[in-house]
A protein has these predicted regions:
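Short, solvent-exposed amphipathic alpha-helical segments in soluble enzyme
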Residues: 45-46, 70, 86-87, 164-171
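Secondary-structure boundary elements
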Residues: 18-28, 45-50, 75-80, 87, ...
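Conserved C-terminal alpha-helix-loop-beta "cap" of PLP-dependent enzymes
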Residues: 130-242
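Conserved active-site segment immediately N-terminal to the catalytic lysine
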Residues: 44-60
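Catalytic PLP-binding core of fold-type I/II PLP enzymes
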Residues: 10-42
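Active-site C-terminal subdomain of aminotransferase-like
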Residues: 57-158, 235-243
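General beta-strand structural signal in soluble alpha/beta enzymes
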Residues: 29-33, 51-55, 138, 174-178
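Single conserved hydrophobic/aromatic residue that forms the stacking wall/gate
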Residues: 1-9
Length: 243
């Protein structure tokens, strides 16, 4: 199951896990936890999942971890993953750390606070988008199971303008103007904006979307609300008030 963008809410994880185990007690419940860490009081393993995985350049890295991922859950399954991803017999005992454990632990320590800033940014964006007539998912008044906000920009110009506004307000490469381009795995061109300190980081303010109707935009992240609010304001202005 995937948790991102509310694909599977906490209460649904428990329901799906119970239903699956009723049909097959030996089944393994696996959850892609990306974008969802620290947004709820419970994590998937507390709601019936056997194994969860995620990325350290998303929520749990706190914007500090430069790379990496995690696997958590049942001890026997984590050990099997370690043997598979490293080497039989070595498991978690040996492996490359890239001299980054300090940044990983520091990022994990800061992560709950950073995720709170990202959710504040999402709520602000949702309010602002509703004021200009959009229908963001989720709404500002709804439960937030992850840090992602999506909305239909309705036109290609609006989607491109929104992404360029996010990029222009970013701390890195703010001079760049994102352009739609082909992307492996997509049938349409995709535009992405991410002026982040860590390449590919989505706990930092970023957005993307495919160039096809209804031109859905996916907005996520925000290391701190003060800077991220400015980014959202500029993005909305660039998309809907250029004239």
């Amino acid at each position: 199951m995937s948790r991102g963008l509310g694909d599977v809410y906490k209460r649904q994880i428990q329901k799906i896990a119970d239903t699956a185990r009723a049909a097959n007690p030996e089944i393994i419940i696996f959850v892609d936890n990306c974008y969802g860490e620290f947004t709820q009081m419970k994590e998937p393993c507390q709601a019936g999942a056997d194994l969860v995985v995620g990325s350290l350049i998303k929520n749990p890295g706190g914007g500090i971890a430069p790379t990496g991922g995690y696997i958590a859950g049942r001890k026997d399954l984590v050990e099997l993953c370690a043997y598979r991803l490293n080497a039989p017999g070595l498991g978690k005992e040996l492996g490359c750390t890239l001299e980054t454990p300090r940044d990983m632990y520091l990022g994990f320590y800061y992560a709950p606070g950073v995720v709170c800033e990202a959710i504040k940014t999402a709520i602000y964006a949702q309010c602002l988008l509703e004021l200009v007539g959009k229908k963001p998912i989720p709404r500002y008044c709804e439960d937030h199971n992850d840090i992602v906000t999506c909305f239909d920009a309705d036109t290609a110009d609006a989607l491109i303008g929104f992404c360029r506004g996010i990029q222009a307000a970013s701390p890195v490469d703010s001079y760049a103007a994102p352009e739609p381009s082909p992307e492996p795995g997509y049938t349409d061109e995709v535009i992405m904006a991410s002026g982040s300190f860590t390449q590919g980081s989505t706990i930092e303010l970023s957005c993307d979307g495919p160039l096809r109707e209804p031109y859905t935009c996916y907005l996520q992240g925000g290391l701190n609300f003060a800077a991220s609010r400015a980014g959202v304001l500029l993005a909305v202005q660039n998309a809907y008030f250029k004239d």
